[in-house]
């Protein structure tokens, strides 16, 4: 779901916001090490590795940034879409979103939930 304290769209001038929704509640990820010294061995680090659940728009933003980076790598670095720009990336992300029976776009989810696999699935020749 969407966090209670997340803002809702649309914008005052009726632009659709948010564009897409990304996971930001109960996302599993690594927790940063604290108090580690350079003398710590790799084994000690592995033994002390911790994962935890995190919440917040910063988590959703990081996941979205990683998704965009992978999409840009596919388009520009791997030469699949050399004309890729921010508008194209936005269109790709919207095209690949998951939509779950609600009216889209809407004030809570925008065009749907972020789904990088969905982007590539939509680009695949049918």
Question: Each PLM stretch: what is its role?
Answer:
Residues 24-104:
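Hydrolase catalytic cores
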Residues 105-114:
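A glycine-rich, coil/turn loop motif that links secondary-structure elements
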Residues 18, 114-115:
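Substrate-binding/active-site groove segments that recognize
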Residues 116-126:
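Secreted peptidase-domain scaffold signal
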Residues 1-30, 94-97:
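Catalytic-core segments of hydrolase enzymes
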Residues 20, 67, 110:
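Divalent metal-coordination and catalytic microenvironments
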């Amino acid at each position: 779901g969407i966090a209670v304290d997340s803002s809702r769209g649309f914008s005052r001038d009726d632009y659709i916001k948010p564009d897409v929704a990304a996971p930001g509640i109960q996302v599993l990820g690594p927790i940063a090490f604290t108090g580690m010294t350079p003398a710590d061995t790799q084994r000690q680090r592995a033994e002390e590795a911790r994962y935890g659940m995190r919440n917040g728009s910063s988590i959703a933003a990081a996941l979205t940034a990683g998704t965009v980076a992978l999409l840009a790598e596919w388009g520009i670095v791997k030469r699949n879409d050399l004309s890729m720009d921010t508008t194209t990336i936005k269109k790709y992300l919207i095209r690949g979103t998951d939509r779950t029976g609600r009216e889209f776009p809407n004030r809570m989810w925008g065009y749907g939930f972020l789904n990088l696999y969905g982007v590539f699935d939509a680009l695949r020749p049918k």
